[in-house]
Amino acid sequence: MADQSGNAAPPPVRRRSSANYRAYATEPHAKKKSKISASRKLQLKTLMLQIAKQELEREAVERRGEKGRALSTRCQPLELAGLGFEELQDLCRQLHARVDKVDEERYDVEAKVTKNITEIADLNQKIFDLRGKFKRPTLRRVRISADAMMQALLGTRAKETLDLRAHLKQVKKEDTEKENREVGDWRKNIDALSGMEGRKKKFEG
C-alpha cells in the first residue's frame, strides 16, 4: 500500500519463530579473521616463555650469590693450625658466646615482627569498624503479634487510629440459637400447612 507521496511502504518486519531463532543460533557463522596469524601467535608465546625462563634463572643466580656473600662475611674460616688445648677452649667459648648473641638478636627480631603483625591486625580492624564492615551477629526469629507490630511502628497512635477487630462483623451466639429454634423440623411445618397432619395420625393409629 503506497502512501500519499507515492513511495511504497516498507514490508512489515516478521518476527523469527523459536525454531528459526534456534536454528540461526546453532548454525556456524563466519568468524572474523584475526590480524595475527596462528604461527605468529605461537612464535610470540614461545619468545615470552623463553624470556620468562631467562629471568627466573638470573634471579636464582643472584640469590645464590647474595647467600654466598652473606655466609662469607658472617662465617669466616677458622684457623686451627698450631693451636693448643687452652686456645681451642677459648675459641669454643667465643663461638658459643657468638651463638648466644645471634639467638638473642633472632628472638628480638621475632618479637618485633609479632608486635608489628598484631598492630597491623588492630589497625585493619579499626578501618573495618570505621567503614561499617563489622561482623553482623546472627539474629533470632521473634514472634510478634499484629497489635504489637503496629504499636512498634506507630507508637501510641496505633490503638487510636487502627483497631482491626472493630471492623469485623460480630455474631452473637444467642442469635444463632434463636434462628435454629425458629426453623425447627421443616417436615412438621410442611404437614401443618398442607393439612396432612391429621390424616397422618389416623394411618399411624
UniProtKB/Swiss-Prot annotation:
Phosphorylated at Ser-17 and Ser-18 by PRKD1; phosphorylation reduces myofilament calcium sensitivity. Phosphorylated preferentially at Thr-26. Phosphorylation by STK4/MST1 alters its binding affinity to TNNC1 (cardiac Tn-C) and TNNT2 (cardiac Tn-T). Phosphorylated at Ser-37 and Ser-39 by PRKCE; phosphorylation increases myocardium contractile dysfunction. One of its GO terms (cellular component) is troponin complex. The modification Phosphoserine is found at residues 5, 17-18, 37, 39, 72, 145, 194. InterPro entries: Troponin, Troponin-I_N, Troponin_I, Troponin_sf. The modification N-acetylalanine is found at residue 2. Residues 27-74 are annotated as: Involved in binding TNC. It comes from the Eukaryota. Residues 124-145 are annotated as: Involved in binding TNC and actin. Keywords: Acetylation, Actin-binding, Muscle protein, Phosphoprotein. One of its GO terms (molecular function) is actin binding. The modification Phosphothreonine is found at residues 26, 46, 73, 138, 176. The record marks 75, 92 as: Involved in TNI-TNT interactions. GO terms for biological process: cardiac muscle contraction; skeletal muscle contraction. Residues 1-38 are annotated as: Disordered. The modification Phosphotyrosine is found at residue 21. Belongs to the troponin I family. Binds to actin and tropomyosin. Interacts with TRIM63. Interacts with STK4/MST1. Troponin I is the inhibitory subunit of troponin, the thin filament regulatory complex which confers calcium-sensitivity to striated muscle actomyosin ATPase activity. This is Troponin I, cardiac muscle. It comes from Equus caballus (Horse). The gene is TNNI3.
